[in-house]
Swiss-Prot record:
Its main location: cytoplasm. NCBIfam families: PRK05751.1-3, secB. Belongs to the SecB family. One of its GO terms (cellular component) is cytoplasm. It comes from Chelativorans sp. (strain BNC1). InterPro entries: SecB, SecB-like_sf. One of its GO terms (molecular function) is unfolded protein binding. HAMAP family: SecB. PANTHER family: PROTEIN-EXPORT PROTEIN SECB, PTHR36918. This is Protein-export protein SecB. Gene3D superfamilies: SecB-like. It comes from the Bacteria. Residues 1-21 are annotated as: Disordered.
Length: 168
């Protein structure tokens, strides 16, 4: 392979302590922090139904620095299924990942932590939820893809609105 000409790669490299560090985002580990499945009405709640249950899904993302360039990102998924005002199941998953992020400009850190990291975690968390509901006697709950960029923008807008209220 021929060497590529070197150019200004600001998007891929940033100055860190006077040294040029290639920008990288690495998953160091992934883990289940908490998993809970409840089917309070079993076995009656497992019977066949004429209509699909209503399912409410909530998603949350949190990130915490671990020191240096390492961050712990937590993706929380909760789902509650109800039919005829009876809870069929509740499932909650807190799925974490430890990420090493280096070489990116500071203004890229929040989008990386709240968009890219959960985007990498989501397929694994989705499968855990599907397996938990299937193992609980229900059809697997296949959560639709999540737009983490939109969630992040909404979060920023909510924080800005709170700041404006506090200043008033």
């Amino acid at each position: 392979m021929a060497d590529q000409p070197s150019g200004n790669n600001d998007a891929k490299q940033a100055e860190t302590n006077g040294n040029t560090v290639p920008a990288s985002l690495n998953v160091l580990t992934q883990y289940i922090k908490d998993l809970s499945f409840e089917s309070p009405g079993a076995p009656q709640s497992l019977r066949a139904r004429d209509k699909a249950p209503s399912i409410n899904i909530n998603v949350n993302v949190n990130a915490n620095p671990l020191g240096g360039t390492d961050y712990d990102v937590l993706l929380t998924l909760t789902a509650k299924a109800e039919a005829d005002n009876v809870v069929l199941f509740n499932v909650e998953l807190i799925y974490g990942g430890v990420f090493r992020i280096q070489g990116f400009p500071q203004e890229h850190m929040l989008p990386l932590l709240f968009i890219e990291c959960p985007r990498l975690l989501f397929p694994f968390a989705r499968q855990i939820i599907a397996d938990a509901t299937r193992n609980g006697g229900f059809p697997p709950l296949m959560i639709d893809p999540i737009d983490f960029a939109r969630m992040f923008q909404q979060r920023l807008a909510e924080e800005e609105a709170r700041r404006k209220v506090q200043v008033s």
